Amino acid sequence: MKSIAIVYHSVSGTTHSLAKAIQQGVNTFSNDNNNNNIEVNTYRILPQHIKDGRFIEKDMLELITKANAIIFGSPTYMGSVSAQFKAFIDATSSIWSQGSWTNKIAAGFTIGSHYSGDQLSTIQYLQTLANQHGMLWVGLDDSGLQESNTPNTSGASSGLITCTHNNELPEEALLAAQYLGKRVVKVMSGF
């Protein structure tokens, strides 16, 4: 059985909602295509997972490492991932030195309070993380230009980028998150 790990940090709950929508997209696509051999797990980085600025959940890292694909998610804070997500990233250095994530599928998602809130920098940071680990990055193949009802309303192709509207997620963001989950399954099925 193949598996997907969605690892993310969320403070206000919007990144959590995106992670759950991605999980729903994976499950829906798998069920619709009679592909029940894909397991998807979410791993939320919580305050108790950080001690003295360091991510300390080695068991979580081991579970994530067992996955065939990893989808990274963080809110955009000051043009990058949150400090808590950065602590998780720093904890992957031992995984990097062993090459344990090499050739795994990777994707990413982020949310900010404004569309011009430098979310692309966050996605590029996640993409760099994946590249350093030798992972294969999956972006969105929907530019948002083909039709007006596309889920990718930001037009970003590197990953899922969205923003809140009055601290709420627009329906399009949840649809785009589901689409990202489906896309990762499609790509993963080719390996």
Each language-model region and where it sits:
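N-terminal beta1-alpha1-beta2 submodule of the flavodoxin-like/Rossmannoid cofactor-binding fold
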Residues: 1-100, 147, 153, 161-191
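Short, glycine-/small-residue-rich phosphate/pyrophosphate-handling segment
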Residues: 105-151
